Curated annotation (Swiss-Prot):
Homohexamer. GO terms for biological process: L-histidine metabolic process; positive regulation of gene expression. Belongs to the HutP family. Antiterminator that binds to cis-acting regulatory sequences on the mRNA in the presence of histidine, thereby suppressing transcription termination and activating the hut operon for histidine utilization. Transmembrane segments: none annotated. This is Hut operon positive regulatory protein. Coiled coil: none annotated. InterPro entries: Regulatory_HutP, Regulatory_HutP_bacillales, Regulatory_HutP_sf. Keywords: Activator, Histidine metabolism, RNA-binding, Transcription, Transcription regulation.
């Protein structure tokens, strides 16, 4: 079970991604001893979304260079979140779809038991639709993985 109801790593990632005022959510994240970062990405290509999130994770110290398990956990969390955003069909451009997303990454130890280790959550929130202005709709995705 989670340390405390307000310390759920996925919930915090979602709140951070959808928040118009992320400072409030970031304060809760800091009090939970988690790391977090936010960013934006827009593309018709899934690989560019993955690359943008990976770059933010490396730049903010979420994953260490040369530590395979950290990068692997991040990739799984990103792909799981993309499945939510794209309703299971991760292709974008080949289906004439584009996304404009805010993303949040949260890393930490959400469980009381130390042996449960660290986890990483990636939340994506924004719009998806045809590459025609005004033809998109809201979408959200969440991926959580252990490190």
């Amino acid at each position: 079970m989670s340390k405390h109801k307000s310390h759920r790593i996925g919930q915090l990632a979602i709140l951070l991604a959808v928040s118009e005022e992320p400072g409030i959510v970031e304060a809760s994240i800091l009090s939970s001893d988690y790391q977090s970062c936010i960013g934006r990405v827009g593309s018709m290509e899934s690989n560019k979304i993955v690359a943008a999130i990976e770059t933010a994770a490396k730049k903010n110290g979420f994953i260490r260079e040369g530590v395979y398990r950290e990068a692997h956990a991040l990739y799984h969390a990103i792909i799981e979140a993309l499945h939510g955003v794209t309703r299971g069909q991760v292709q974008l451009g080949s289906f004439q779809r584009t996304v404009g997303l805010r993303f949040a990454i949260v890393r930490g130890k959400p469980y009381k038991e130390e042996a449960e280790g660290e986890w990483i959550a990636v939340a994506l929130y924004g719009t998806i639709g045809a590459p025609i202005k005004g033809q998109e709709h809201e979408t959200i995705g969440l991926g959580i993985n252990h490190i």
